[in-house]
Amino acid sequence: YMMADHPEVIDHYVAAQSEADDALYEVLCSCPSPFVTLGENIDAYMDPPPIWLRHLTPYYRRRVTQLREAGKYVHIHVDGAMKPLLPYLQLCPWHGIEACTPLPQGDVTIEEIKEALGDLVLLDGIPALYFLPSFPLEDLTGCVRRLVELFYPRLVLGISDEIPPDGDIERVRLVGEMAQGLV
């Protein structure tokens, strides 16, 4: 209700929080690692397009530009619902998107992810569900082939988001073997 009834209060909070992040980003810019993943865990239901466009896009543009000027490669973690945000993912100057989760776990197809990302790097991309013994192995292998076909060489193939506790580690090994054979 605050966003509708008192947007000036929200704007003040966002500005104050952004300023509070200055010290963190100074440290990130000076650290020796060339890679920074913004681990925000973005979900379109928590950050729908109006919030994304008004508050998050300006913030990320500023911070990603700051990191890039320091020589960093920047990615953001988007593993929740993402379909409503697809048209806006390229509004920020990050290098890639991490943990995009296609169907059947997520709400988008691999092709929709590719269209939205364009030349951005995809990190991960394999639904974690495919590592469960209850899912057909052919679903996993088909997904891996399609990801490599659409995204390679702009792909860091991995599990979106983590292997489940009861996931089959042999499927992880299989993905590694497949990746070597596909590229």
What are these regions (language model features)?
Residues 1-183:
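Active-site loop segments of alpha/beta catalytic cores
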